Amino acid sequence: TNTPARFLFPMFTATDLDELMVETMGRYRWEICRRIQGVYWNDIRERSLTSEYCDYIQFYRKNSDLSADAKEKVKTALARARNSYREVFVKDYISWMKYESAGSFRLNKVAREILVRYCPFAKDVRVNLMQNPQYQNVFRKLNAENAKKVQRLTAMYDKYEAAGGEITPELNENLKYYQM
């Protein structure tokens, strides 16, 4: 039961294969987070992609970080997605991967912060985007959070190894993820 995920795409399709892959990855991220979180997928006390995104969508009207125009766009996106939070996330994820990665702003501040935290770009993309003042604060915050996690994990791993434990490849991969 511990096998890698597999994605099947049609050989012949009317849509662009790259867009189809990005859309599928957005759905996958949402569903895997729901599966991992279990019944807490929507509970903001358990911080996760789905819980923070649901909180953002549910309470966008009261969110002071959103302008009136941004609130209207969220309302329209929610109506277009037939009140499906997953579909709103997938559309934002597509914009994140397609446009925001190239430096073109399509998302509001709140959605961007959630996606930076849970769906970060590769280091070279982040370095290019750091030139832009819109991204500097969120990437600085991400780098600080990651540095804190690296420090905590390194201390934990050192303590574990000192007690005679062995660090598995999965734990090393986890550490590398935060070092990126």
Predicted regions and their residues:
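Active-site-flanking segments in enzyme catalytic domains
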Residues: T1-Q179
